[in-house]
Design a protein with these regions (language model features):
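Transmembrane beta-strand segments that form the barrel wall of outer-membrane beta-barrel proteins
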Residues: 245, 328-334, 581-590, 739-740
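Short, small/polar-rich motifs associated with maturation and membrane association
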Residues: 1-348, 353-355, 360-362, 366-368, ...
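Outer-membrane beta-barrel "beta-signal"
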Residues: 604-608, 733-736, 931, 984-996
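Glycine-rich, aromatic-lined ligand/substrate-binding cores of catalytic
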Residues: 837-869
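Glycine-centered tight-turn and secondary-structure capping sites
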Residues: 680-684
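Outer-membrane beta-barrel channels and translocator barrels
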Residues: 66, 136, 308, 319-320, ...
Length: 996
């Protein structure tokens, strides 16, 4: 018995021994592989949930633990580390990066989000740090130069005109839609919905580029997919409130064109020297009537420094069952044209709930209200030249005229003999205002009845109501002639979407992993428009539609609708974590085509080889990651009118005193999908633990293009839409990023993107080799990209100072410069200029760096091989033809008998410069798109109080520098020509971000 008691006592002492071990204080630091401190890391005693601490800002910690215990250190983004105490007083830890944790999970289709390393498709992601605090009102503008192969060009800098032109891997169709599909949180949406979002609500933007990534979206993904994920709250997170504010000014990005116009003295001197007007004529027409001012009109027609500000408030957090994010924003920008402004208000609510282990649901809704007032004639040629001073061509007004009257008020009269009105006065009395009410969002339910089997049902809507009011004030027309006009219009547009998917993820063994997805999607698009207008109002106080004359009242109404129905499936298979394969199939049906041809099947196959996991590379330290990707698939394009396949009739003139009708559009029951095949291969990876790269080649072939084909004159129809012709785009994408410097409290990184795209028309219609479009100054030529077709300017004849043009050869598709003529014939002299309509090269680069709390980032974007016809130059470069307009200083270099090598002709002979290649300018450019300087206050300075957790001060600039040879208003405009458009704007903004 005694032996038994001794044995029990001994065992109790052995068990209790550790409990009586002596506690000692252990301290040390936790750093990463670069030697930088890791603040907030958890340092815990192994086996205990109550003994532990968190590292300070400098990575240090201090903790009292048993001398024979073990410390465990963990932090998000790093692998867990542990070390026995063994009586030591100092223990330092170096944490290794955990690539699996650091890697971002993104959504690329209808299923669960995936980590980038497991995605076979080509996907480029831009995070919120690049997008937030954007000076532009559009988040899409921030993508310029950020994604290889994605071309983003801004239309203008007019407040409220935040549209951009976006194409991926070239222009994939000659006449059907060429814009990507926009998806917001899983719901296909319009570009308008994206542009009416607050950029600070966006978590990330993923651009899906190859067939493996896009084929799941079928017919709408022929031009790529831009997937936008908005911010959301996190479960088990304390509530936080973040305020962001930005205040600054905007102005024209470039005023060099306006500054190159002549002053009054320069213009009058030029007229006399060039033999356009005599001094006597100038005296009698201007000076004797008191018109001896020197007005720089662009300074009066534009407000060059305008306020811009934005205020955001975000509340986010979550408990064990609910996560939430609520954000409100207000944005204001005053434009540089008189009366122009843009106001936007948004409210976003993103709430997710996990009430049961097998049930998840959520609501994500964005409401927006915007109000825009614009100059109705800015950039428009609707009124011809009679009102050219009302908009973007106002700088052509003669500088001898006054902008203000003798009382310092805006000059309200017509200038004698000119039929011209002061631009400011004209715009102030021609009001054009838009109110837009938008809603975009979705509701989803996710059920997981058994582990890894998920059923998801999602309903979404993207819609808006737009109200437009326009009027020409009666008091204005009473003083200047004409007729008052008042009009109102309303438009309603929405797209309703419902998606149901089932997804099952499983593995047979550790070497064989599968994910299977099947789904259904239905989309309904609807648009309706109504307008009413009248004229003849006589009093500003009674300027309503019903105050106009009875015979002037006009009412119009229209509507349009379309539907899509789709079924799809997707399979992912991973073999030994080294070989990943995916396959997609989708059937789409569209109401835009006849019932016999409206269904189409699209598919893709893709594979990825994770080379780094092979034995021959596993131990090669210079290679951190290396992946080879290959994919091929098909997509469709239905980007045409909703009723292009139907036979339509329209009203025409009277016959036998009865209203007549005519065939406006012939029926085409065989009209069907434009098709595309896309092959992509890529090599991605990381070398030497500092160089990230992504090299990609693509071949994109479009067939059965949706083209408006000319019809015989005897048919009475100009053109009809048919499936004809084919087009090819091929090219390379290069994305590089590497660390220049990285130390304990400083860093510097360089990133760059590059795309080269080769376009080629491979087939037209009716056996044609060339299809010139003279009014657009371009032509489609088999075997070539879309080319500029113009008369080719041959310079000035040194003998007589008259302009010359090259005579085309037998084949106008080949540039010929052998013979010249001085007799201009537009179509007869038109030939291939050798200049491409679409730029083959675009990209960008950024340099970012930081030291402690200070950070700087500069983003540049560029386009090479871009050309624009400067239509404006036809007016300011033709002083003999437009002798009552101002002109550019450059035309002073004109021909005289003593100056025979001049760039411009002998104006005294009435020489006229024509629409030819002298107006076709190189519009390639390099632009400092964004510059951001930020400073985050050290937490030690905030430690004296508990309210403010983080405080950041920022300075942001946009479009600060532009390098280009283009002499027009702005080289970034995506068009074949420019005419009176508003150039891009430049912003300077200061900001503050406070987190409570």
């Amino acid at each position: 018995m005694k032996k038994v008691l001794l044995l029990i006592a001994s065992m109790m002492l052995l068990v209790a021994g550790p409990a009586f071990a002596q506690n000692i204080r252990v301290s040390g630091t936790v750093t990463d592989s670069n030697g930088d401190p890791v603040p907030g890391a958890a340092v815990m005693l192994q086996g205990s949930t109550s003994v532990g601490t968190a590292t300070l800002a400098n990575g240090s910690y201090s903790l009292s633990v048993p001398s024979n215990g073990t410390l465990v250190v963990s932090s998000v983004g790093y692998k867990e580390a542990s070390a026995p105490v063994n009586g030591r007083a100092v223990i330092n830890f170096v944490l290794e990066d955990d690539a699996e944790v650091l890697e971002q999970a993104i959504a690329v289709g209808y299923g669960s989000a995936k980590k980038i390393s497991s995605i076979v498709g080509s996907v480029s992601t831009v995070n919120s740090e690049t997008i937030k605090n954007a000076p532009s009102s559009s988040a899409l503008d921030q993508l310029q130069g950020q994604v290889a192969g994605l071309s983003v060009l801004s239309y203008s800098g007019i407040a409220g005109d935040n549209a951009v032109s976006m194409t991926l891997h070239g222009v994939g169709s000659l006449e059907a839609s060429t814009t990507p599909l926009y998806v917001i949180d899983g719901i296909p949406s319009s570009s308008t919905a994206v542009m009416n979002m607050n950029p600070n609500d966006i978590e990330s933007v993923s651009v899906l580029k190859d067939a493996s990534a896009t084929s799941i979206y079928g017919s709408r993904a022929a031009n790529g997919v831009v997937y936008i994920s908005t911010k959301s709250g996190s479960y088990n997170t304390k509530a936080s409130v973040t305020y962001r504010g930005q205040w600054g000014v905007s102005t024209l990005a470039d005023t060099s064109l306006y500054e190159s116009m002549m002053s009054s003295s320069e213009l009058m001197d030029f007229w006399v020297r060039a033999g356009i007007h005599s001094q006597d004529w100038i005296d009698s027409t201007y000076l004797s009537k008191g018109y001896n001012y020197d007005t720089p009109w662009y300074k009066y027609m534009m407000d060059l420094w305008n306020p811009q500000y934005q205020n955001d408030l975000t509340i986010e957090g979550g408990g064990s069952k609910v996560a939430y994010m609520i954000a409100a924003s207000q944005y204001h920008q005053k434009g540089y044209t008189p009366g122009n402004f843009f106001d936007r208000y948004t409210l976003r609510s993103n709430v997710q709930a996990h009430p049961l282990e097998w049930l998840k649901t959520g609501v994500n809704l964005n409401l927006s209200l915007s109000n825009t007032q614009q100059n109705p004639n800015w950039g428009s040629a609707a009124n011809g030249m009679s009102n050219y001073t009302s908009g973007g061509l106002s700088f052509l007004l003669i500088p001898m005229y006054p902008a203000l009257d003798e009382n310092g008020k805006v000059y309200e009269k017509k200038f004698p003999g000119q039929n011209r009105i002061t631009p400011t006065y004209y715009m102030e009395n021609h009001i054009d205002q838009y109110d837009r009410y938008g809603a975009n969002g979705n509701v989803f339910v996710e059920i997981e009845p058994i582990r890894n089997l998920k059923f998801v049902s999602r309903v979404g809507v993207d819609g808006y109501i737009r109200l437009n009011n326009w009027e020409t004030m009666p008091s204005y027309v009473a003083a200047n002639g004409g007729t008052a006009t008042v009009g109102h219009s309303s438009a309603l547009e929405y797209a309703a979407n419902i998606t149901n998917t089932v997804e099952y993820t499983f593995q047979i063994t550790d070497d064989h992993k599968f994910s299977v997805l099947a789904g259904h999607e239905g989309v309904e698009n609807y648009y309706t428009y109504f307008s009413a207008s009248s004229s003849g109002q006589t009093d500003d106080r009674l300027a309503r539609v019903n105050d106009g004359t009875a015979d002037s009242r006009s009412v119009s109404e229209s509507y349009s609708e379309s539907r899509f129905l789709s079924f799809f499936g997707h399979l992912d298979y991973t073999l030994m974590d080294r070989y990943i394969f995916d396959a997609t199939i989708r059937n789409d049906a569209s109401s835009r085509f006849g019932k016999d041809v409206r269904n189409a099947l699209f598919w893709s196959l893709g594979g990825m080889w994770k080379l780094k996991k092979e034995n021959f590379l596993k131990n090669v330290r210079a290679v951190n990651d290396l992946n080879l990707k290959v994919s091929y698939g098909t997509q469709g394009n239905a980007g045409i009118g909703n009723y292009s396949h139907l036979g339509l009739v329209g009203s025409t003139g009277k016959y036998a005193d009865a209203n007549g009708i005519h065939v406006a559009q012939p029926a085409n029951s065989h009209l069907t999908w434009e098709r595309q095949g896309l092959f992509t291969t890529a090599l991605t990876g990381r070398l030497f633990n500092f160089l990230d790269f992504d090299l990609e080649y693509y071949l994109r072939k479009t067939s059965s293009m949706l083209l408006d084909v000319p019809q015989p004159y005897t048919s009475g129809i100009d053109e009809a839409t048919n499936n004809v012709g084919s087009l090819q785009n091929s090219g390379i994408d290069v994305t590089l990023g590497f660390d220049i410097l990285r130390g304990r409290d400083y860093w510097m990184r360089f990133n760059t993107t590059f795309n080269y795209n080769a376009q080629k028309v491979t087939e037209l219609f009716d056996g044609k080799h060339t299809w010139p479009m003279y009014s657009y100054m371009i032509a489609y030529v088999v075997g070539s990209p879309v080319m500029f077709y113009n008369p080719v300017f041959a310079g000035i004849d040194p003998e007589d100072g008259m302009p010359m043009w090259y005579v085309p050869g037998d084949d106008p598709d080949v540039l010929t410069m052998d013979k010249t003529t001085k007799v201009f014939d537009d179509e007869g002299l038109t030939q291939n200029t050798g200049k491409k309509r679409y730029a083959p090269i675009n990209g960008g680069f950024s340099l970012s760096g930081g030291w402690k709390g200070l950070s700087v980032q500069a983003d540049f974007s560029y386009v090479l091989g871009k050309y624009l016809v400067s239509n404006d130059g036809y007016f300011y470069g033709n002083p003999a033809n437009f002798s009552t307009m101002n002109t550019n200083k450059a035309v002073s270099d004109f021909w005289t008998p003593d100056h025979r090598d001049a760039k411009w002709p002998d104006w005294s002979k009435g020489a006229v410069m024509q629409f030819d290649t002298h107006l076709l300018e190189d519009a390639s450019f390099l632009r400092l798109k964004n510059l951001q300087i930020a400073y985050s206050l050290p937490k030690v300075l905030l430690g004296w109080q508990n309210a403010v957790k983080d405080l950041k001060i920022t300075f942001t600039g946009r479009n600060l520098l532009t390098f280009t040879k283009y002499t027009g208003i702005d080289p970034e405009i995506n068009s074949n020509l420019t005419y009176g458009v508003g150039g891009n704007s430049k912003q300077f903004l200061g900001g503050i971000e406070v987190k409570f």
